[in-house]
Amino acid sequence: MRIYKNIPKRILSLCLVFAIGISMGVLSDHFVSENSRFQTFTEKLFRSEVCSNTLTLHYTLAHPEKKGIRKPEATLGTALSDPAKTTSLCQEYEKELKSFAYSKLSEENRLTCDMLLLYFHTRASLGKNSALDEPLGPGLGVQAQLPILLAEYTFRTKEDISDYLKLLSTVRPYFQSIIKLEKQKSQSGLFMSDTTLDRILKQCHSFVANPDSNYMDDIFAQKLKAFSNPAFSSEDQKKLCTYHHKLILTEVIPAYQELADSLESLRGTGKSSRGLAFFEGGREYYLYLLQSQTGTYVPVGQIEKRLSAQLLSDYREISSLLKQNSSLIDRLNQCSGELTLTPTQMLEKLPELMKKDFPELKDATYELRTVHPSMKKFLSPAFYLTPPVDTRTPNVIYINDSGRTSSLELFGTLAHEGFPGHLYQTVSFAENNPSDIRYLVTSSGYVEGWATYVESYGYEYAASLMNDPDSAKNAVRFAWLNRSMNLCIYSLIDIGIHYRGWDASRTAVFLKAFGINNASTVAEIYQYIVETPGNYLKYYWGYLNFLDLKTVCQKRLGDDFDLKEFHRRILDIGPVQFPVLEKYMK
């Protein structure tokens, strides 16, 4: 130390500045190199995952060649997988992620690293329980979703049309891989119940019933007519439509028929309609679903306790509202009549109504389309189709004007699908230019939980459009609470069936306590939840996580809490598992 004592202060100051400059430069270079190395890893991971099948690639990227990705031969892939290989690969990814100097990563990359670590750790935990995976199902199964995904396959170039036609020829080998998987499940005592089988077969038979008037032909012709890159002549359109119809007759319909026949041959080899709890490893698999789909890692007992508390809270609020106004239900019935806006007008109103609670978007262009008449019975009242990540357009909301919902319910649905729901959340997240892997590795609990959370705001906004907003406010609040209670009840039943081992009788007793006695209604609720484990919790447990996170932030910040800024932070972080979201909200 004495050596430096005699150095003039000015020189010492210059030396220190010089030393700091060098060290900062070295550190900066190291920071950059570590972030660059991490980004190279995520880009490589994205390219690997996005090319798994043609549908994933096409729906994710409009121009894969601009990212150095060569389109592989058009294929739907296979339903078969090697659990040991998958586990090993996930563990390798986890090991590589842990090799990065975490403290030297930017906050954005640390967040991505946390999300990926949890994602691959969770996937690796599945192991042999992957045998309980079920690709088929009456509502959400592959055989139900595939025609819709094919029908909505965007034609941007002539190559897209060529790929689409090739995909039709791969439906049969893809379904054959599912048949092989189902035979393996049958041999292991894991095949579906005859009740579920009947529901799937009914759908397959419906699809093949009128081969000469299949709705996919109509939609293909409609898309060809609209294609302009460059446009086809009438003669070329006719030739392509003829070829398409031939593929439907010789490839797609036979594939569905073969699937139906093969499944029928396995009738009786499955157990009666029961939840996952009745299968070996079923409870562990259900926990895996909660983690991988819902993004929650809290004990099941804690989830049940929170659900029960919310159910009681909603019930008490409903009772209080009815006590204040015994004619509230009559007022609610009037509300739907007063909300006379068209879907287009509803979507135009929502961005303006939500300004006080949610950040305004820079650009929120979208298209509103009507579901093709032949697809109405298969689809929900409305749904949002996400755009490719490299174009971010078009943002498309489909309206199914089948008349199955009231105007108030439709308004809530459009808030869920549009503003401030899925469309708004997707566009908000994209404005931050996240890494591509964030679009592939996501969290359904965040995505559906957010849309359900903001749906409650949608109901509130609807009240402001009524003839008498003040009296409508409580009536519309009643409607939301009723919806919340239904979702909560179904979520508790989901846990009861798949984790606690409830059978149909036990489920009926539970529903009876809430005044649901109709035998066919009870049977339908039970069967749907048996076939879709964890599905309701993606929506409702996700919703409660956002609700609770808001309460935590309100308590911590007190008068400094700003609802719009709270929402902005959630949107900036984007879809991640809830432990990761909570970490970065602090």
Predicted regions and their residues:
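N-terminal Lys/Arg-rich, disordered targeting/topogenic segments
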Residues: 1-7
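N-terminal maturation segment of proteins
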Residues: 7-586
